[in-house]
């Protein structure tokens, strides 16, 4: 186990959910990763990274071919979530902006297909919908038009951190 806390919190949550008769629904931010060295830079997608005065040396993205390293990493993590914790109720993907802008890089349908191959009953959710093949959407501040069923999470402030 390569976790600083030396605990697998997802496993603990999965066990607690099963014990309580609840389905495990997992959140995964596929559209932004501030720590992976090969995620998109701010020059391609503004919220992709914090706005540092100087780009940290750990950021190694130089061209779109580098993105495959991030995507392989994300797919491996999602596969782990689908195989290591028993049946899951679903996966809720977040930050859709980069996925909209670079749909050919993310190839989100391939990820959806992988999830459904491993966990056929799992629901797939992606904010306002990435490609229309989500089971439902969860708009925030606005409602998308790709998926027919949605839950609303509208904020009354100017910033989600308020």
Model-predicted regions and their roles:
Residues 1-158:
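Mature catalytic domains of secreted/periplasmic carbohydrate-active enzymes
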């Amino acid at each position: 186990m390569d976790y600083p806390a030396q605990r697998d919190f997802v496993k603990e949550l999965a066990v607690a959910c099963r014990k309580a008769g609840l389905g495990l629904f997992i959140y995964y931010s596929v559209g932004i990763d501030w720590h992976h060295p090969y995620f998109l830079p701010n020059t391609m997608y503004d919220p992709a990274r914090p706005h540092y005065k100087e780009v940290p040396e750990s950021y190694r993205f130089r061209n779109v071919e580098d993105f495959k390293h991030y995507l392989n990493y994300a797919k491996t993590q999602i596969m782990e979530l689908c195989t290591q914790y028993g049946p899951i109720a679903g996966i809720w993907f977040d930050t859709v902006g980069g996925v909209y802008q670079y749909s050919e890089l993310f190839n989100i349908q391939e990820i959806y297909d992988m999830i459904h191959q491993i966990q056929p009953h799992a629901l797939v959710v992606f904010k306002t919908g990435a490609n229309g093949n989500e089971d439902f959407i969860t708009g925030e501040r606005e409602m998308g038009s790709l998926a027919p069923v949605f839950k609303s999470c509208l904020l009354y402030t100017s910033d989600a951190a308020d």
